[in-house]
Amino acid sequence: ESQGGDAPHEGRARTVLVYMIGDVNLWQEQWTNLNRLEAGWNDDIDGNLLVYLDPSPHTTQFPNPVLLEIVPDQTDAIVSRVVKSYPEQNATDKAVMRGVLEDAIRMYPAPSQGLVIASHGSGWWPAFADELVPTDDEHDIPQTRAIAGGDMYGTDVEVNDLAELLPIKYDFILMHACLMGNVETAYALKDKCGMYVASSATLPGASLPFQYITEAMFAQPAADFYHLIQTSCAFYNTLPEDEADLLTLSAVRTDRLDGLATATRALMEKVTADPELFYDKLKDRAYTYEDSPYQDLRQVLALESEGVPELQSDYEAFCKALADAVVLTGDVYQTLPPDMRLHPDDFCGLTCYTPQPDVKMSELNAYFKKTYRWADASGFGLLVGYQGTPETTPVP
């Protein structure tokens, strides 16, 4: 139900929609983020800032989902204007999600559109991975939830489905969720956004400081992600250690990802010729990001190329393509885990999945190769089907 009619709000340079799934265990942080968005907004900004709120039952101000137009406010109250109310609905249902996105575009048309997705995340790693991978006490798969929906429904939206349902190509997509800075997700969304911004690591519960970075999303002629990333890192430097161990952020130009895929494949075709040697080079050396299956893309290919002179030209071409695509990175840390085999200052801005050579992973590896275009384009899919001996099998 629209509040005040359906007449479009025209004349602004950019509309940014924050798709906020609040019915999760981070509901208090999401509520804080709403306050931060109001604090960071001012009426001189040439744009529209909207929030689709899928509310937690704990936030009784909004019993049902709403589309909010953010207005400036420095208090703890949420005073933004409800422009549309929705019946109870599943925020990660594909039809529901597309409908909300279309509402925002129709009601607040602008020549530039941005999208922020705020929820739990695990990159492309599917929420139904436990159906594909037999588990026991000795081999547990990482936590999986794709982009998590509300607790009421217990559903998720997979990255390939997200790419399909997005109604337009956005100027940027910012993922306010854990582990979304992986190349498989960026490549899946390359035709649906010009710039992709995300965290390779888990996103600390302190969230991004929207009170300081909101204006950067509306900079002209394009959003200022240098300011957004640097300000976010500076904010985390002020927090107590127990609130922010590690933050990583990167901005990726999606129009350069095909070039990265081509350069990656040229190298992968050579280093995968001996799969056992490939995995042996990574064993106990490549860092796996927290409770995920992801490793740093550059570190993987650096380890594979190390000490092989005939691979250096291909590796250098890969590094150039990577630097062309990942235009900004930022990190800040308080303490690092003792097993961290990659210093945050060395992270390249994109993680990757290396198909794991375990018979238990065969169905999931096949899903990866069939579903995600990066697998074939980059050559990582060449590893699907290889099954290593137990001593060479990396376990996330």
Task: Name each region found by the language model.
Residues 2-111:
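N-terminal extension/subdomain marker
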Residues 54-84, 112, 116-152:
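Surface-exposed loop and adjacent secondary-structure segments within mature catalytic domains
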Residues 21-23, 56, 120, 254, ...:
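Generic structural motif
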Residues 106, 130-133, 137-396:
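Terminal, contiguous helix-loop blocks that mediate binding/assembly
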Residues 15-20, 48-53, 113-117, 171-175, ...:
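Structural recognition of the beta-strand scaffold that forms the well-ordered cores
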Residues 23-26, 119-125, 174, 178-182:
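Gly/Ser/Thr-rich loops at beta-strand to alpha-helix junctions
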